[in-house]
Amino acid sequence: MQDSTSAPEITPELSAAAHKINVNKLEKAPYDHTGKHPGNKSFSYLLRLMINVGKSVIFRNFEADKIPPNNGGRISIATHINGLVDPSLMILTQKKRIISLGRHDLITGPIIGWWSRRNGAQPVLRKAEVEAGVADENFARKINDRSMLTIANCLAGGHGAVIMPEGKSHQDSKLHALRTGAARAALASAAIARKRGEPAPVIQPTGLHWERHYWFRTKSYVEYTDPIEI
């Protein structure tokens, strides 16, 4: 079995959209460090409705385990091979209001960005953008720190988060090197929750299974194991 030390460090190829940094929109993206969700609650309900309709169209058969209940926040993590379909199913199969991390252009784009901002999604400027000279390192650190602090406070406030530790969607049959975001969010949110006298969040491993992930109208199954206490 491949362990994390041998997982390949593969820099993602930047898309045309990823090459365009909208500094103004990134700075104005909603965030909150008090524990409140930065998104609009009505849009959260509307997003779930849209995902549910999309699920009925995309999948011929869909099944999901009942997610283990917990009193605090929840960090759902999974491998990432199916783009926006992966986090969508993780959002749909739980009741907690979700805050997510997304590539910067998914937050600033003209259509999906409009939805993302209203649902409180937090932008991330990746190492790939910095190394390619697309993003300034200091600006990237500022945005990423702000986003991670928002995620941590939301989790401490009892909300859920969807994080893909590989940091990108890919088609390889092996795990790519993991980013540290999920672990940092877990530790920070647990510390904040305990200081506030609230239950610490848990890490919820999630299995996303497909009969053929590249087929339209394929079968899908979302698996939930026991959560990991922090």
Tell what function each PLM region has.
Residues 1-27:
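Intrinsically disordered, low-structural-confidence terminal and linker regions
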Residues 2-8, 35-230:
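Soluble catalytic domains of membrane acyltransferases
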Residues 29-34:
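Generic N-terminal amphipathic, Lys/Arg-enriched alpha-helix
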